A protein has these predicted regions:
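Helix-to-loop junctions at the C-terminal end of transmembrane segments
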Residues: 117-130, 213-214
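A late C-terminal transmembrane helix in Major Facilitator Superfamily
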Residues: 182-218, 226
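A membrane-interface helix-boundary motif in multi-pass transporters
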Residues: 13-29, 210-230
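Structural signature of the two symmetry-related core transmembrane helices
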Residues: 132-147
Length: 243
């Protein structure tokens, strides 16, 4: 979806379409994808039906797992803040510095990297385990976030798009099953709380970026803050006691 929308916008720019016409083009693409999704929901593949009936075992109760639940909430909120600045402002990092390349193509790379990421990170969780997989995911994400602050070159921005695109959905893939396994340890809906905190991070990111940009006239302070948030999240995961 990210890839299609980005390339649709780039096509609109190349054809000198107005913003209203580009919005209509994006709406057409969304409508086609919605039709496919509705058809899939009405006749789900047999594999999805079987998977929906698979029961998962609950871990043993105790103070350690309760602490793990609260720690995961903090990690997820920090992750929401950490990725959103790059995801929001990525094309602007190259805006005005390229003559013949539309910066919106960076969004296409972001989407291409995200497309297979959930499947890959799921396999990596099975191989490495939750703690190592999420720690590495957040560290790679932090690296991708900080790269444009080191250099606004095309290479660094492309690497940033690929790294953040490949890892941000991986964070969700790794964290939500863990949240489900810990949900019985808290008195509220764990998945809902995680989604809310992730959203708070997503809202706070652009607001803080705007404030810092007014002070420094640069995205670098916000990128450093986002990378720091991801490093703190990685540290919280890495130092968690293993059951």
């Amino acid at each position: 979806g990210i890839f299609i929308s980005a390339e649709g916008i780039a096509l609109g720019h190349a054809l000198s379409l107005t913003s209203q016409q580009i919005w209509l083009l994006c709406a057409l693409c969304a409508g086609l994808l919605l039709a496919l999704a509705i058809r899939w929901l009405l006749t789900p593949p047999a594999a999805l039906v079987r998977a929906s009936h698979v029961e998962t075992s609950l871990p043993a109760s105790g103070s350690d797992t309760r602490r793990a639940a609260w720690r995961l909430l903090m990690v997820y909120g920090l992750a929401g803040f950490g990725y959103i600045i790059t995801a929001t402002y990525l094309p602007l990092f190259l805006s005005g510095s390229l003559q013949s390349v539309d910066p919106v193509h960076l969004w296409a790379l972001f989407g291409l990297a995200a497309a297979p990421s959930c499947l890959i990170w799921h396999k990596l969780v099975l191989k490495w385990g939750y703690r190592q997989a999420l720690t590495r995911n957040l560290l790679f994400q932090a690296l991708g976030v900080i790269l444009p602050a080191c250099s606004a070159s095309l290479l660094f921005c492309v690497l940033s798009a690929l790294l953040v695109g490949f890892t941000f959905m991986g964070t969700v893939t790794i964290a939500l099953p863990k949240a489900k396994s810990l949900s019985h340890q808290v008195s509220f809906n764990m998945i809902a709380a995680m989604t809310a905190l992730y959203g708070v991070g997503q809202i706070a990111g652009p607001l803080i970026t705007g404030a810092l940009y007014q002070i420094a006239a640069s995205f670098n302070p916000a990128l450093c803050a986002a990378a720091l948030a991801l490093l703190i999240a990685a540290g919280l995961v890495f130092t968690e006691r293993q059951a």
